[in-house]
Amino acid sequence: MGIIPVELYQDREDGKPAVGVRTNGPATLQDLLDAWQPLCDDASIYKQYAPDNYSVCRGCQINCCNTAYVMPDLIAVRKMAEYLKTDYRSLMERYMQMDKTEAGVLQMQLPCAFLKEGICSIYPVRSLICRFYICTDILGATQQLIYSITMTGITAAAVWAEKEGLVQSMSNRGQSSFDLLLQRLLNEYRSHEQVKLFLEAENYSDIPLQPFLNP
């Protein structure tokens, strides 16, 4: 049996059990996603919103689409358009908040337009922010890794859309305090070398984890 590139483990942090990941040699973002997905089907891990706190995630109606702003990463944007057999501009006009798009930020409608009876209708091509969502405690280092990867992908989507003429350059006109905070974060991440990894990738398997582990 070969070495597993990414594996999950449980530890305690701040007196509570939490989930973390460790890498065993070279690994890709797809390896991380492959390791992460089984958490959703693991009924032995404490989940805040699950029935009796221990259940699989399938069918749960308290999901990322209802509890978080859904901002797609670049790989997800491309995969969504392909999955839905539409062009990028139509994808944005139909499923994203146009006032945010006009300000240079890609953000799904609220509630998410892809929710059908509380279930994601594009599950195979959902965004990183959705793939990583789980209502259990995550170790700090792992949480920071996931945050960094997700924000990098979201930033890459904004950079790409701007270059393609699909959105305008970022503007703070008429934006909320949250929008302004998000714009500051995106501007900060634009200078990160890891953004290029998303811009040059076709799939999550094309993105190495190492640059995010040692930025």
Stretch-by-stretch model annotation:
Residues 1-215:
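Short loop/turn segments that flank or connect secondary-structure elements
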